[in-house]
Amino acid sequence: HQLIELRNNITSWVEAGEYRRRDVPYKEILETLNTDAATMRVFMKSENGMDFRSWRNKLRLQEACQMLAGHPEMNAEQISEYIGYSDSSNFHTDFRKFTGMSASEWRRTRTKTGQSN
């Protein structure tokens, strides 16, 4: 029952775009999701195979990929700020690790092929 409630709370949290908020203390996120650190750790490992921070970054980077393809009027810095990065250099480093290329390279390849993911 507790894990079902947590799953529902996380789904609502994601749908509300809360993962984009930057500088929110982890303790506050746990309170919002009505859970504790131990339960969250077990849930994230079993459901997603990673810790909360890594999972949240993955959500942000997936959104960045969609935005790079779908919003040519926005540059990578604007997108990084929108998805919750306070430092664009961290975004660029994380994006390269996630996709294997820079944001501009990724955008170029998706623009040519018409793909968005």
Give the role of each language-model region.
Residues 37, 41-55, 85-86, 95-104:
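HTH DNA-binding helix-turn interface
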Residues 46-83, 109-117:
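Terminal helix-turn-helix DNA-binding modules in bacterial transcription factors
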Residues 71-107:
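Sequence-specific DNA-binding recognition helix
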Residues 2-10, 25, 57-60, 72:
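N-terminal positioning helix adjacent to the helix-turn-helix/winged-helix DNA-binding module
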Residues 30, 41, 80-81:
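The alpha-helix within a helix-turn-helix
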Residues 9-24, 44, 48, 65-74, ...:
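Basic, amphipathic alpha-helical hairpins
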Residues 28-36:
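Helix-turn-helix
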Residues 1-11, 15-20, 111-117:
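Inter-domain helical "communication" segments and dimerization helices
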